[in-house]
Amino acid sequence: MSERVNDKILEKAIERARERNIIIPTYEQMRDPSRVPESIKEELRGIGLWDLHPRNLFRITWKNDPETGGFGGVNYLELPQELTGVKARIFVLLGRFFPTGSHKVGATFGPLVSRLVTGAFDPTKQKALWPSTGNYCRGGAYNSYLLGCPSIAVLPEGMSRERFEWLKKLGAEIYPTPGVESNVKEVFDKTKELKEERPEEIVVLNQFEEFENPMWHYAVTGPAMEEVYLKERKGGQRLTALFLTQGSAGTLGSGNYLRERFPSIRICAGEALQCPTLLYNGFGAHRIEGIGDKHVPWILDARNLDMVAGIDDEACMHIIRLFNTQEGRGLLRDRGVPSETVEKLDLLGISSIANILGAIKMAKYYEMDGDDIIFTVATDSMELYQSRLRELGSGYTETQAACDFERYLKGATTDFMAELSYWDRKRIHNLKYFTWVEQQGKSVEELNEQWYDRDHWRKKLNGYKRTDELIREFNRRVGLI
């Protein structure tokens, strides 16, 4: 969505922004906060990272400085060989330092903002509905609040307690649906029901089909990875691989950016082994919150994948205990993992562990050495999963920690991985038909365009440039800068 829809509604959005002291950042500023006006940087010094203040829209970036409250370099962590067991260098971008503690505020920024600046969303009458299995609705409700827009969250009742508490704090309407992480159809069904009941009031912002989701990662996350690579590479080291578990497939938009910059990169999409939709056309429930929803997202560019992999949720649950208990951390130090790394392991949430395991599996599968660099992300931190940690119980011992370290980290294997041929990629792409054409109203023509139009994804993902023009015009008319 890149052109004006309704000038009268646009004027209402501008007036709401003026009343609520709202200034919208551009994608360019989120990628490079040095472009943020000094007056806004000065305001941010007195505003907390999670505060419900509209200026925190400018903190939707990988470059928040947790020490000063200003901006700095990309927040990331390199995992040493003593921890991973592989020679390849693995870098993890850290989502903990975004507002809400997750980079999902980026994925939810575009769908709502693109409508506000084109007059496609009336903040005085309409509500933004965020269907989700986790952090997406948290980020969406947060951005809605900052942008002066009422919100609705639809998510499975089995998600962590921390998610529901946060949504209540934001005043969102909350509709829990039956099931857990992979029960996305129930979320879709409730969303459809609410939309039919309140067609004029509700605007559905579905992360699985909104191209502004991967567009944000193409414009912001991909360049952040490139920046870290250029800073950290030594000698003949090369950017070899990207591993990302996929729920909505938004983060994989960074892979489209990296493919343009580094054509030989290998990109692997991960999912829970207990719900191997991409790997085996499979299904099932699992415990890796935020990924694997028993369908192929509309916004997944299957052509850009080289590999898919299944990550055992049992491994992830064992490793969060290893990383977040006194016994586990003591064991890691004894095994030579630097204390500086050990003290930061709480920056890795459950899906982050899955990403790290996937990166290790890729390093082993392709027999990578010290000249290879792999990137992944930590969507969030353990701050959002303390209830899950408590559910695992107490009484964790050093012996258990040693077993978990050897079995799940050092013992990570190359099973449940598949390199993709042309027809493997097309098989994954064709699975979109059953969710999106049969159930969600998309057309076969749209589906085929995604596959056969070689320029389709480039045009979609570069839409942020036009959106930036509209944001600047919107801010000019609001008149606060």
What are these regions (language model features)?
Residues M1-I481:
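PLP-dependent amino-acid enzyme catalytic core
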